[in-house]
Amino acid sequence: VLSANDKTNVKTVFTKITGHAEDYGAETLERMFITYPPTKTYFPHFDLHHGSAQIKAHGKKVVGALIEAVNHIDDIAGALSKLSDLHAQKLRVDPVNFKLLGQCFLVVVAIHHPSVLTPEVHASLDKFLCAVGNVLSAKYR
């Protein structure tokens, strides 16, 4: 459960991220595909090379969904309900991939904003990303 302090920390981080959705999202996906190659199986139709327009576009969607979750941090489940349905029922993405994506996103934030990602903020952002992953996995049950 996200505390009031966690919510404040997450919102603070996302003020730094909002203008970089496409770049940070693409970097997160590229990092995930390289670090966890089996995740590429969900994107057989994508050009997975660095700088790919498809990766940039999807990365922007990923970070856009995270921003939507931040904007509705008290109702993440409601904010991401349609996305949860899509991933569970149509795309059938293995839920473990949400955790992997979250880890890669944390690394990207740490690279670009090291002074913001204090241990306390890191813990809050990790809790938030786990909450998002849990919401996206909920419809699998």
UniProtKB/Swiss-Prot annotation:
Q: Where does heme b bind?
A: H87
Q: Which GO terms describe its biological process?
A: hydrogen peroxide catabolic process
Q: Know the name of this protein?
A: Hemoglobin subunit alpha-A
Q: What does the subunit section of this Swiss-Prot or TrEMBL entry state? A: Heterotetramer of two alpha chains and two beta chains.
Superkingdom of origin organism:
Eukaryota
Q: Which residues form the Globin domain?
A: 1-141
Annotated family: Belongs to the globin family.
Per UniProt, what is one Pfam family of this protein? Globin
Q: What does this protein do?
A: Involved in oxygen transport from the lung to the various peripheral tissues.
- Binding of O2 occurs at H58
Tissue specificity as recorded in UniProt: Red blood cells.
Query: Electron transport: present as a keyword of the record?
Result: no
> Record's Gene Ontology CC terms?
blood microparticle; haptoglobin-hemoglobin complex; hemoglobin complex
Q: Does the keyword 4Fe-4S apply?
A: no
Tell me, what is one Gene Ontology molecular-function annotation carried by this entry? oxygen binding
Write the record's keywords in alphabetical order, separated by commas. Answer: Heme, Iron, Metal-binding, Oxygen transport, Transport
Q: Which organism is it from?
A: Trigonoceps occipitalis (White-headed vulture)
